[in-house]
């Protein structure tokens, strides 16, 4: 009973859009990216919104992404997710997210992960 109450409180504290975003993130991005420690495959996306592009010291970024520079804003993340190769030619990122609602859900979720 106590565990169920704790679970209900946790679910109530999580906005529905964040839960949806987390599910979309896990489906579209979670195969390579985490919101915890960096994997060998891809950099962590914890705190990505507002972070300088290609700035984590524990990940070896592609020359294309390093050359892009800038900051990961909501608009930049949307453009990158739409077509990574067009946004940063030479990037190793190969997965795009063509659906605008999915991209928005992912970005909204990433804004909550600090």
Model segments located where?
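C-terminal capping alpha-helices of c-type cytochrome domains
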Residues: 73-114
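N-terminal signal peptide c-region/cleavage motif recognized by signal peptidases
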Residues: 11-16
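Sequence/structural segment immediately N-terminal to covalent heme-attachment motifs in c-type
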Residues: 18-40, 45
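Short Fe-S-cluster ligation motifs
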Residues: 57-78
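Positively charged n-region of N-terminal signal peptides that target proteins for export
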Residues: 1-4
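Sec-exported extracytoplasmic/periplasmic mature domains
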Residues: 26, 30, 34, 50, ...
